Regions:
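Switch/connector loops and helix/strand junctions flanking conserved nucleotide-binding motifs
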Residues: 1, 79-81, 103-104, 117-122, ...
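C-terminal accessory regions
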Residues: 118-178
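Short glycine-/polar-rich loops that comprise or flank the Walker A/P-loop
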Residues: 29-30, 90, 104-107, 156-159
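Conserved coupling/interface region of RecA-like P-loop/ASCE motor cores
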Residues: 1-29
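Helicase-associated low-complexity regulatory tails and linkers flanking the ATPase motor
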Residues: 9-14, 54, 58, 178
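Conserved helicase/translocase motor-coupling segment
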Residues: 36-117
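Structural preference for long, well-ordered alpha-helical segments in enzyme cores
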Residues: 1-4, 47, 51, 145, ...
């Protein structure tokens, strides 16, 4: 929860909120473990091993969560690639981060960057000209990227692993927490 709040701290336009965990922390629980330098094509075998290990961890712990491991990405393509290599008997559900809103699992594994989109001068000008928005288009997209990171992080009940090529956006904020 605290890692999710750390990501939300970077959102410029938001309603402040704090969360309370509803379960006590158990040995082995942790917030987000960031794995940088990850390339899906080269790192797929190790990722499959990690997912399998997390399924075994959840089985040992006799969790009451209906889903052992939730595999998340912003896009469907990486999810399909990973699922094609996973043992179908493993208790893993794969969703885009948007579709996973409201779901949870004992362990969440995120494969994504959640980086904001590139600057867009025309949309910034339209936002400013319309008078409807307090912020620029670029700021709105950066905020949305961080909110999406928050949603992904808070899907994991006891553990979260985030695999990304480079720390940027939400993962960059997490890499600074020390």
């Amino acid at each position: 929860i605290r890692d999710g709040e750390a990501v939300l701290a970077g959102v410029q336009f938001k309603q402040a909120k704090t969360s309370q965990p509803c379960k006590p922390t158990q040995p082995g629980d942790h917030g987000v473990k960031l794995v940088t330098g990850f390339d899906l094509n080269k790192g797929l075998p190790k990722l499959i091993e990690a997912i399998t290990a997390q399924c075994a961890h959840v089985a040992e712990r006799q969790s009451r969560e209906r889903t052992a491991v939730l595999l998340l990405s912003r896009r469907n393509e990486p999810l399909r690639t990973i699922q094609a290599q996973l043992d179908r008997k493993l208790p893993v559900k794969a969703y885009t981060i948007h579709r996973a809103k409201g779901l949870q699992a004992e362990v969440a594994i995120i494969v994504d960057d959640c980086a904001p989109v590139q600057p867009h001068p025309l949309r910034n000008a339209l936002y400013a000209y319309s008078g409807f928005f307090r912020n620029s288009y670029d700021q709105a997209m950066a905020d949305e990227s961080l909110r999406l990171g928050y949603v992904a992080i808070t899907r994991g009940v006891s553990r979260v692993f985030w695999y990304t090529r480079k720390a940027q956006g939400a993962t960059e904020r997490l890499s600074r927490r020390g």
